[in-house]
Amino acid sequence: VKPAVTSLSNPAPKTGLYVGNSFTYYNCGLVGYVRGFAKAAGIPWRARQITISSGRLSYHPMAQYLAPHELDPYAKGKVKDGKLTAPMFDVVFIQALSTEPIDAKSIPTWKKYLKSEVAEVKAAGSEPVVVVTWAKKDHPEDTKKLADSIISAANENGAAALPVGLAFAEAHAGRPDINFYAPDKRHPSAAG
């Protein structure tokens, strides 16, 4: 499945929100790695990470994450009369529980919440990016299933899809000497 949205309307986002679970926070969190890469490249980047262990999309109150709070530094200078005048985040990365998009029992609920969360992100003026997760180490055949399911759902909702899982599989295949997985065979190692 090919992504329908292949670029962001803001080609140089400066703020982001990562919404996910342990795939997002494992090994000190994705937010720290991306911040380091951005800093090394001289790219301005600030981000917040909100994760729930074993969290499904339905566990995340997205509208609350994007609502202004008087002490929130991401809302500073963007609130008038209790309402946002500009988005708190340029981009919001939405990452589901890794098996939700391919588990027959989970798919309907996952699609329902992905649709509502993408709509809430857009309503807040941010751009939604749906994260394509990677397969478990002992189930590499799930890589394509995950990518197809997630990209299809992102397309249906007018959201970009970030092919992390496809890149993870390609890197793992290209460097079999590096262990990309933690001992549990699902979370990433520091190299992953």
What are these regions (language model features)?
Residues 10-12, 180, 192:
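Conserved catalytic region of serine esterases and O-acyltransferases that act on ester linkages
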Residues 15, 24-109:
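Conserved SGNH/GDSL esterase-like catalytic core that processes O-acyl groups on lipids
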Residues 19-20, 131:
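Short hydrophobic segments within beta-strands
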Residues 11, 40-42, 123, 156:
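Short, well-ordered coil/turn elements that cap or connect secondary structure elements
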Residues 77-190:
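Alpha-helical cap/lid subdomain in secreted, periplasmic
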Residues 14-17, 127-128:
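Short, surface-exposed connector motifs at secondary-structure boundaries
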Residues 1-15:
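N-terminal low-complexity, Pro/Thr/Ser-rich intrinsically disordered segments
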